[in-house]
Structures are given as C-alpha cells and as structure tokens.
C-alpha cells in the first residue's frame, strides 16, 4: 500500500497531495487485500521434502529457507497460524519429522520451527562429527522411547547428509541405534531384534521412521493401559516401619492442675509391688473435647502440675482399695488412674520438711531439735494431766509453744 500511495502522489505532482478520503479508501483497500496477497504469496512458495534429490516443484533447503525468511514479515497472524502455513510447504520426510516434533511440543513457535529445520536439514557437519553425535544419542532419564526416536531421527538425517549412511541404510541404522540407546519392554525388544536379524540383507524391508513410531506408541499405550494401573505399590519393609517416628509416637501427656482435682494416694501394703497408684478426681465437671486446647494451655506453676501419660484414659480400671474390693472406672475423663511412682507431695514426720519420707530422711542436723521438741511436748502433756487432776472442771488443753 505504501508503494501505491507513493506512485499516486508522484503522478499527481509534488504540490497536489491526495485528499483525505483517498487515504482512507486506500487503507481500507489494503486491509481487505492484505490476506489475499498473503495467500497468493503462500501459494507461490516452493515446496521442500528433505529428500537428497528434490523432485519437480521442490526446492533445496537453502532456497526454501530463503523464501520463508522473506515472506514471514508479511504474515500478520498468530504464531500457530504461521506454523500451520509453514507445514503446508513441507512434503515427504521433512513434513513427517516436523509433524511429530509439533505433536511432542504443542507450543512450538516459528523460531523453534525454523531452528529444528536447520538442525535436521541444514548445512551438513563433518562425517566424523555427525557419526559421533548419532551413536552417542541415547535415551534420557524419564524420556519416552517415542520421543527418543524423534531426537534420534534428527541426528540420523544429519549423518545421512554428511555421507555417513546411505539412504537405503537409514532404516537399519535407526533400528540398531534404537536397540542400543533406548529402554523398552522385553517383548518389543525381541520383536525388533528379530526383524533386524531376518532382514539383515534387505534393509529396505525394515520398518521406516513412521512405522517404528507406530510400533513404539502402541507398546506405550498398552503398558499405560494394562501394566501401570496394576503395578502394586512397593511394600513397606519391617525395618522402615520400625524406624518410622510414628511407630514410637505415644499419646500426648495430659497436664492436670492441682487446683482442679484432688490427688489421693493409696498406701502400699507389704504385698504390693514397687508400683504405686494415683487417683485423680476432679472437682470441676469434665471438659468437652473442643476445650482441650484451652485446658492444655492453662498457665499453672510447675509444682501444681501432674503429668500423666496414658494411651487411653477411658478404658483404665480403678485399682483395688485397702479392703481388696475393686471396681471399674465409670466416671470417664474425670477419673484418671496410672500405675506409676508417686507424683504427690510427701511430708516427712521426722524433720518436718516436704519432698521425702521418714524412711529416707538423712537430715542429721535437725535430730537434736526433734528430740528437744519431743521432750517439750511430753512435758506439756504431763503438766496438762496434772492440772486436770487438780481442777476437774477445767478443760484439758495444750499450751502454745514458746
């Protein structure tokens, strides 16, 4: 349109510009004729097949790439439409290779499309380099065999253009490298090895690129349908279960404030074992399970907290009392029993201190004071008895210690 405007302007003279309506009409005409001109340019593009000897109406890769580079700036359309138009200019092996590459990469744009074309059909490398790349192309970890074959085909075409293999040897070289560099099922590997052995002297009867892709895809679909869904999960070994932290996880400790409950000790009899019993009886009504977080988060001092570790506090039975009679615990969460060592405060009758019993008291420094207090107490009791005898109506009492 710019060339048309310049020609019209020059024909009318430099001092006679076009009226505004002419510019508007030409712009509308350009928008209408643009797709038609692009379609005509596409129809005039020569074809490319990738064969060693181009057929009638086909171009070499260099000529095809040159005309594509010249027409791309006039294609004002999305990338997908550009790739679709480029595919229309391909025939034969070139079309099949790029179709498979596009299927493996749905988001293929024009830049990647041309880069792949240059890699497969561009200038040939040296025969040593091309052969080395081909034989060193192996399947990557996690890569499907079908995608590996596409990658292998790129290196095979480069090797053919470099003169490493003849056209009739392509099927044999492709199949041999596939067996070397790919991981596949035992059945498919056996079938391909058998084909390679049977048609060793007739390589043209071996499966070509498209037939090989079809065989591999059928095998992959069969494995995904019948084998992968039935594959059992790996059984967890006994050692893994033993080392699991969940195997040693017990019930969380229950913190009970001494303000909310009474701790009752049941004295041991000579027949009892070394395990004592603690009865915890609440003064408040049981808390619902929804308030467990606030119950556990209550701020109390350390000497007012009793920690009881119990796997199931609702199924513990009450121990037998001093009379030997036992009863089941039917009070639910309120009554907790645990056969462990004493957790309550013990008062020593020997030295008057807390934290130990008379049998384990070793406070030698206070023994004299204890005896002195005992003598004073006995004297007061004697005096009180004498006063009671002297004055029968007077009440008996103990004088306050001085």
UniProtKB/Swiss-Prot annotation:
GO biological process: BMP signaling pathway; positive regulation of transcription by RNA polymerase II
GO terms, molecular function: nucleic acid binding; SUMO binding; transcription coactivator activity; zinc ion binding
ZnF (CCHC-type) residues: 346-363
Region of interest (Disordered), ranges: 1-20, 383-402
InterPro entries in the cross-refs: PNMA, PNMA_C, Znf_CCHC
Keyword Transcription in record: yes
UniProt keyword annotation of Zinc present: yes
Tissues/organs with expression: In embryonic brains expression is restricted to the ventral region of the forebrain, including the septum, amygdala, caudal putamen, and in the basal-forebrain cholinergic neurons. In adults, expressed in the brain, and at low levels in the testis.
One Pfam family matching this protein: PNMA
Protein family: Belongs to the ZCCHC12 family.
Function: Transcriptional coactivator in the bone morphogenetic protein (BMP)-signaling pathway. It positively modulates BMP signaling by interacting with SMAD1 and associating with CBP in the transcription complex. It contributes to the BMP-induced enhancement of cholinergic-neuron-specific gene expression.
Protein name: Zinc finger CCHC domain-containing protein 12
Organism whose genome encodes this protein: Mus musculus (Mouse)
